[in-house]
Amino acid sequence: MLQLGATTPSFDLEKEIDATYPTEHISRALIEEVIPTFEGEQWQVPPMFSAVKVDGKRAYKLARQGEEVELKAKLLVIDEIEILRFDEEKMQLELRIVCSKGTYIRALARDIGLRLNSGAHLIALRRTRVGDICVEDCITFEQFTTLIDNEIK
């Protein structure tokens, strides 16, 4: 889920909002026009708060030390991007995204905000699939602990 109209240095809730932007011009029609432009191959600059290595050091460590470095854009693929819900009052946008390995959804939030001539950051993320493993095929934490307890007995 994206919060439109504000950005953070980490592109998510890890850091406080550092800037706010107009949202009066953002409508469902504009979102429906902009979102499909993200399907296909995209060049994406990773967030500073990421595990990408810069001269052998993790970018997030450098960012936490206050150092700014230029990260190189990486080619990725967004196979599908679908609008699930847009709350015009709260300026929150929920999407379903099928993407390639290495895609930073936080950076995608940033890029969507920019294309909407505003800002955006990620406020919620739920992975529903990693490779061939789908959330529907998984067990809950409670089910896991029950299995472990039964194995120990």
Where are these regions (language model features)?
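Catalytic/RNA-binding core of pseudouridine synthases
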Residues: M1-K153
